[in-house]
Regions:
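Core segments of cupin and vicinal oxygen chelate
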Residues: 11-13, 22-72
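Intrinsically disordered, low-complexity acidic/polar segments
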Residues: 30-32, 77, 86
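Short, well-ordered beta-strand elements within core beta-sheets of diverse protein domains
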Residues: 21-24, 91-97
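Short, solvent-exposed loop/turn segments at the edges of secondary structure
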Residues: 63, 87-89
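Vicinal oxygen chelate
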Residues: 2-16, 45-48, 69, 76-79, ...
């Protein structure tokens, strides 16, 4: 079924849109952007900051908007005050190619935060991250039902970062 908003549009209509996650901070958006850029080994930059308007309810001594890039993905950090907090309902997944990259990124992001189940962590700002080896998705698509069950069991029993060799061994049986 075609959604009503798409009725009458050609099926091959190309949309030149970009998804830009907006992250709501109390007042640490600029600090968080710099922290994330450092965690990604400098693979990012602060694009722009926008000062708070005098009539805005946002904090006046920090930028209200901090636009930044991480690994080619654009984000917006908003210093909007304490009314909203991050939760696990939304997480950022970073797919890494090997254990060294996983270990380095994990250590940088979990610093001041906490380890969570299933390869997740919560950073010091409360934002949830999944640091996932690309091998995980390869194992899921290449394995049979028994291999996938073993892999999922290994994932569900993990608290903290993934050990790629352990996931591979679980999938192999």
């Amino acid at each position: 079924m075609i959604p009503p908003c798409a009725a009458g549009l050609p099926l091959m209509t190309q949309i030149s849109a970009q998804i830009v996650p907006n992250l709501w901070f109390d007042r640490q958006a600029e600090e968080a952007a710099a922290y994330y850029i450092a965690a990604f080994g400098g693979n990012g930059r602060i694009v722009t900051t926008v000062a708070s308007h005098p009539d805005s309810p946002s904090p006046q001594d920090v930028p209200v908007v901090v636009e930044f890039e991480l690994a080619g993905q654009r984000f917006v950090g908003i210093n909007g005050g304490p009314q909203f907090q991050f939760s696990e309902a939304v997480s950022l997944e970073v797919r890494v190619s090997g254990q060294d990259e996983l270990d380095r990124l994990w250590a940088a992001l979990v610093d001041g935060g906490s380890e969570q189940p299933c390869g997740w962590l919560k950073d010091k700002y409360g934002l949830s991250w999944q640091i996932t080896p690309t091998d995980y998705y390869d194992l899921l698509t290449e394995g049979d039902d028994a291999a996938n069950a073993r892999l999922m069991s290994a994932v569900l029993s993990t608290h903290g970062k993934f050990d790629i060799a352990a996931l591979q061994a679980a999938a192999r049986g």
